[in-house]
Amino acid sequence: MAKKKAFIPFFDFTSIVFLPWLISLCCNKSLKTWITNWWNTRQCETFLNDIQEKSILEKFIQLEELFQLDEMIKEYPETDLQQFRLGIHKETIQFIKIHNEYRIHTILHFSTNLISFVILSGYSFWGKEKLFILNSWVQEFLYNLSDTIKAFSILLLTDLCIGFHSPHGWELMIGYIYKDFGFAHYEQILSGLVSTFPVILDTIFKYWIFRYLNRVSPSLVVIYHAIND
């Protein structure tokens, strides 16, 4: 009976962790064909922000410069204008196809993320009892750990999130989220987020130690500072 009670929170925890991934996988399979047909048949007006438009223009200019350079370094100095235009036309079509696939990918991932968020919100609203049981199970599990293990876990987590090497991990994670939601890569915004998030988390963590841990478990705070020093 005790094993069954312990298995239920574990099952709920596993479902919460893997449910978004399963939803995203199923939605990708079912929506990909529909979104591709919708995008290609409706001939939707291209929606670009200033950053994306600037990036596309820069790629077109680079493409033209590469073809001109290719003609200049050929054995014969005469440039075949018709062949040059044909090459530009083929590369332009290929570039448009790549951009079209990128737009479809953006819409697909945005749709799956939105559906996953709605389903998880509904799960958190209608499954309050399961979440309460899961919360009690997590608190009991943490309570049974020794103060040394708790302090070591807190130190490991903080070093991963706000440590010396954490900006590279934040850059990868924020860049992945940016790409997943279809936002254009903008170095200044990405650098601002990477430099801001660890500082905010560090402030929240120090405030949490000061307000909560000092009151609940002073010995844990002492061990944490001893390990940290």
Swiss-Prot record:
Membrane topology term: Multi-pass membrane protein
GO process terms (BP): potassium ion transport
Annotated transmembrane regions: 6-26, 107-127, 189-209
GO MF: antiporter activity; proton transmembrane transporter activity
GO cellular component: chloroplast inner membrane
Location relative to the cell: Plastid, Chloroplast inner membrane
Catalytic activity: K(+)(in) + H(+)(out) = K(+)(out) + H(+)(in)
Pfam families assigned: CemA
Keywords assigned: Antiport, Chloroplast, Hydrogen ion transport, Ion transport, Membrane, Plastid, Plastid inner membrane, Potassium, Potassium transport, Transmembrane, Transmembrane helix, Transport
Family in the record: Belongs to the CemA family.
Function of the molecule: Contributes to K(+)/H(+) antiport activity by supporting proton efflux to control proton extrusion and homeostasis in chloroplasts in a light-dependent manner to modulate photosynthesis. Prevents excessive induction of non-photochemical quenching (NPQ) under continuous-light conditions. Indirectly promotes efficient inorganic carbon uptake into chloroplasts.
PANTHER family linked to this entry: CHLOROPLAST ENVELOPE MEMBRANE PROTEIN, CHLOROPLAST ENVELOPE MEMBRANE PROTEIN-RELATED
Protein name: Potassium/proton antiporter CemA
Source species taxonomy: Eukaryota, Viridiplantae, Streptophyta, Embryophyta, Tracheophyta
Gene that produces this protein: cemA
